[in-house]
Amino acid sequence: MMDNKDLEAEIHPLKNEDKKSQENPGNLPRNEDNLKSKPVPSRLSRCRTVAFFLSLFTCLFVVFVLSFIIPCPDRPSSQGTWKLDYNNAVMYDFLALGDINKDKVQDVLFLYKNTNSSNNLTRSCADEGFSTPCAFVVAVSGANGSVLWERPVAQDVALVKCAMPQTLDSDEVSSACIVVGRAGSFVAVSFFTGETLWSHPSSFSGNVSILSPLLQVPDIDGDGDGTPDLLILAQEGQEVSGALYSGSTGYQIGHRGSLGVDGDGVALLHVTRTGAQYILLPCASALCGFSVKSLYERITGRDGHFKEDPYWENMLNHSVHRRLLHRLGAVRYLMNIPGKAGQDLLLVTSEACVLLDGQDLEPRWTLGEVQVLRKPILGHYKPDTLAVVIENGTSIDRQILLLDLSTGSILWSQPLPSLPGGPPSTSLMTADHRSAFFFWGLHDLVSTNEMDPPDVQHSLYMFHPTLPGILLELANVSANIVAFDAVLLEPSRHAAYVLLTGPASSDVPGLVSVTKHKVQDLVPGSRVIHLGEGSSDSDQAIRDRFSRLRYRSEM
């Protein structure tokens, strides 16, 4: 039988525990401490838990909505190659780029001269008051080559400049193409639609030679819209004069004024370290200068908010015929170059190539005994370090020189024969902060003397500084090249070149073409040219390295 104590404990367990606690009073505080040490769930902690899970589910819901319910915008389907032909036409040496249809792919603008446009639905020469043939401006899609808009703009074009939109919401006036006709027409058309923004006759007569380029100066017409105003230089006899026009309305500001120089060649607008603007112009064997402030006061008769540089004014006042530099030889090219504290000047003459300090015009370096064939271009041979490309020598004896812009030292050189009047070189920034360079030359780099000019083809070569002993021949072109540029149609992913071809003489119309080729599509079928010993990679491995190049926009 069960003991009485055990039976009582089974029937009254709590009572039994009370007896044990009375028998062992020393154990009581320890048990109370254990009870106190156990955390008690609070209302605050429960609220925090609820808030955490609520936030988590909200984030997951938003991700779900954005990923599956709201459709992503369609990326434009970009064709690797497209071509547009015009019969019985003449092509102008002009190319411009910008996102016209706002599909985030750069589109192409160009000029050609023809009896009528390619699209029968667009306006004819007669619709705009021109006789045939006349000049048309055309905007085509960079993605597929379709015509976005096309219209006649002048009887014949002397100057054209397009102000590209900086943002997607840029207004029409600040995003326009300005066209100066040889017969006195002066028109601005919308960059996006081709519609006329304003049109006026210019103040230049038919016997005046209009000098390039069309210069832009800060907004001075007092309308306060911030649109840059326009400066056109013209030469009549030996005298150079200038006229200012409002960029927003096209109306002339004041009257024409003489610069007091007998300049010739291409003008340049230069900004000194003090912010003063000067018009630089080759004149005989010298470099002449004239301040924008003086020109504005001369043509309007009132003071402007422009600056004059005391150092430059002192040089001009102590010179004859406003000459800044003397005994230079024939000035062929003049360029503004980014410097450490502002703009420097790259001056190319018949005798030398000189980098001048942009303030005191002292030489930083000189490359003598050169015969520069074409206008220099800039690129990056080393990461984030500017280099300048010089094409030295005659066409058959041409040599490509890459110079360090800060010192003038030669970084890379390569003989590359070309045809007379060949297209210029260009460069594209790559993701490694260097540049891919594109040069035109002859297909056969060795036996050029045995070729007849009609049988010779232009070849496009690609070079990257990470492979200094390699040239990649991308394409061959037998037609006459009017204009060329390598461009980034889409950020980081769509490098291409655009080519304008047509008759060599503007007096003989013929077939003209606009062609786009994606660079990456040309690399697999390219020809690898080894310039010397040192590369152990196979041709296919080299092509693969060029295919992996990624491009970036220059800031």
From Swiss-Prot:
Keywords: Glycoprotein, Membrane, Phosphoprotein, Signal-anchor, Transmembrane, Transmembrane helix. It comes from Mus musculus. Belongs to the FAM234 family. Residues 1-40 are annotated as: Disordered. Residues 71-555 are extracellular. The keyword Phosphoprotein applies. The chain crosses the membrane at residues 50-70. The keyword Protease does not apply. Residues 1-49 are cytoplasmic. InterPro entries: FAM234, FAM234A_B_beta-prop, Quinoprotein_ADH-like_sf. Its main location: membrane. One of its GO terms (cellular component) is membrane. Residues 1-22 have a biased composition (Basic and acidic residues). Glycans are attached at N116, N120, N317, N392, N476. It is found in: Membrane. The modification Phosphoserine is found at S21. This is Protein FAM234A. It is a single-pass type II membrane protein.
